[in-house]
UniProtKB/Swiss-Prot annotation:
Coiled coil: none annotated. The keyword Cell membrane does not apply. The gene is TOL1. This is TOM1-like protein 1. Pfam families: GAT, VHS.
Amino acid sequence: MGDNLMDKVTAFGERLKIGGSEVSNKISAGVSSMSFKVKELFQGPNPTDKIVEDATTENLEEPDWDMNLEICDMINQETINSVELIRGIKKRIMMKQPRIQYLALVLLETCVKNCEKAFSEVAAERVLDEMVKLIDDPQTVVNNRNKALMLIEAWGESTSELRYLPVFEETYKSLKARGIRFPGRDNESLAPIFTPARSTPAPELNADLPQHVHEPAHIQYDVPVRSFTAEQTKEAFDIARNSIELLSTVLSSSPQHDALQDDLTTTLVQQCRQSQTTVQRIIETAGENEALLFEALNVNDELVKTLSKYEEMNKPSAPLTSHEPAMIPVAEEPDDSPIHGREESLVRKSSGVRGGFHGGGGSGDDMMDDLDEMIFGKKNGCDSSTNPDHDPKKEQSSSKNDDLIRF
């Protein structure tokens, strides 16, 4: 009895020990995660965070487009870390001040429309999760909620451009499955990821913006796209043409298998695709400059042809199948045709063949044999001199008696 009680107490103590260890591990993990978040929120801002704060400060009545586009240039020129910048925008979206949230969403939209790698950073930093939380938060103002919904809808429906990042489409479909109603998108939201430039210059655009500030509860700003200078355009065209020439040379001069597996080919293909994106943006921002538009379209056509040739060579080759040579149908003449009959009559046949063919008829064959003997000195296809039954005396007597051919 005492031993059983001790065993139960020991087992219960072990369970308490194991349970306490698990609880301790969970608490440690939770504290570590919380300390990381607290450190992230309260540590001193780095230079990138300061840039984001200046662009989304609550003192701004409207987006500072010059600053936003300058930030995009800094990302493209890699003078600032794009990961830290997107992370800083995410922090501003998480804040509860409506104006800061809205300006952060506008800055985010500007970056993804003007920076090629911004979408990858948005997906990696889980910015969409914070946007969904903003949408689900009942304290979020309607304007900010609609802005987040419009961005998610535009990205979710851009399956061709963002097919390599499925998180955008999945987030959009998840909200639709929950019955979330998306607001009607304006023309700017319906445009492609890289929106065309407006016909009005930037100063006039900013001058018109205060008129829209007084519109009720649905403030929308057009996101401008940075245009290219003459030097940038020339450099982009030169890079594109050099890439086209090199890739075409590699594909034409090397064996197909070696060309496709070569690292140089892969690098050139990537460079051509990057150049194609840049040239397409030049086309979108060309405006009324017909000479620039014409040159950009020609370069884009050359890029498309070269990349299409690479894709065609990269396709798996179909198994070779043996094909029979093509036969030309020829109509055959029936045996009883007049032509066949005339040709048949021109061929001399032996008596045995003639006899067999005509069923062993007699008089006609004898007549032909006699005619052969008179003309050729042969009978039944044999020379009379070589015939063992040949008798010259009988032949002379026969020739005297038969002056004419008997039928």
